[in-house]
Curated annotation (Swiss-Prot):
Record-given protein name: Uncharacterized lipoprotein MG439
Signal peptide: 1-20
Record lipid sites (S-diacylglycerol cysteine): 21
Membrane-related topology note: Lipid-anchor
Lipid-linked residues (N-palmitoyl cysteine): 21
Organism of origin: Mycoplasma genitalium (strain ATCC 33530 / DSM 19775 / NCTC 10195 / G37)
Places the protein is found: Cell membrane
Broad class of the protein's primary localization: membrane
Keywords: Cell membrane, Lipoprotein, Membrane, Palmitate, Signal
InterPro entries: Lipoprotein_3
UniProt similarity note: Belongs to the MG439/MG440 family.
A GO term from the CC aspect: plasma membrane
Length: 272
């Protein structure tokens, strides 16, 4: 069976195959079928080759397959919430990687705090200490490389201030914000729920998705995006800080241009 024609397989021909993917996305099923039927080693390089050749014949289905693997890994497999299967995770994302390297995630790294708060990004992360995070919605659409959108909604629980350094920083925020006091964040009142929405759209520079997006050396899918991050909370006083404090309100809505995200680990993870 030729690689470039695997994306044209009718779904009925796959009905008797056992596949590891929990998603019903036909592209993921076809990818599993290809490696199983042809007894091809499931390596990152072979996965990239499979996608790159498929992209040359059916761009829409290949991109939707890549997006579906991203969704499956985060929403179905609950990669951010569940304890890691370290062997599987290391094969897909790398031996020195952690959940903070998964895109998206709610951490100083995942929220690009270093670009918003250079020099104090770690302290800001402690001010909004993350206790849990969960992907609750994942939507995507693709028409062409100038018209696509991925939106991922995470819910989090957190605590305002988790050490002496972050407490001092909070006090400096409070000193410049009327209507909020330190007592608003003591005891149980320090706990909060939040919503973080990551929106990925075509980059505004000249980078475009193409066959070169699928690279064999090193094996990667370097997908170009502009990223918008929106954060909100139901905590009344924290919401006041997010609305009025000059430093804190930077977190509320931020846009990052010229980003690239390697989506190969998600595709590979779904096939392992």
């Amino acid at each position: 069976m030729k690689l470039r024609k695997i994306f044209l397989l009718p779904l009925i021909s796959l009905s008797t195959l056992s596949v590891a993917c929990s998603s019903t996305d036909p592209g993921l099923e076809k990818a599993q079928a290809y490696f199983q039927r042809n007894n091809i080693e499931l390596s990152k390089n072979n996965a990239v080759t499979f996608l790159k050749k498929g992209y040359s014949s059916d761009k829409e289905e290949v991109i939707n397959t890549v997006f579906a693997s991203w969704k499956t890994t985060l929403l179905d497999y609950q990669l951010l919430e569940k304890p890691l299967d370290y062997s599987r995770f290391a094969k897909a994302f790398g031996v020195n990687k952690s959940k903070e390297d998964v895109t998206p995630n709610i951490s100083a790294k995942g929220l690009y705090f270093d670009e918003t708060y250079p020099g104090i990004s770690g302290q800001i992360a402690l001010v909004l200490g993350v206790k849990s995070q969960k992907v609750v919605n994942f939507q995507y659409s693709w028409k062409n490389n100038l018209d696509f959108k991925v939106q991922i909604h995470l819910k989090m629980t957190g605590i305002v201030g988790s050490d002496n350094t972050s407490t001092s920083l909070i006090k400096s925020f409070l000193a410049s914000t009327s209507g909020v006091s330190e007592s608003d964040f003591t005891g149980d009142k320090a706990n909060f729920d939040g919503d973080v929405i990551f929106t990925y759209t075509p980059p505004t520079d000249n980078r475009r998705v193409s066959e070169s997006t699928f690279s064999s050396i090193p094996a990667s899918i370097n997908f170009p995006f502009d990223i918008k991050i929106d954060m909100s909370t139901s905590h009344e006083k924290l919401n006041l800080l997010l609305s009025t404090n000059e430093q804190v309100k930077k977190i509320r809505t931020r846009t990052f241009k010229g980003k690239s995200i390697d989506l190969l680990p998600f595709f590979y993870y779904t096939l392992l």
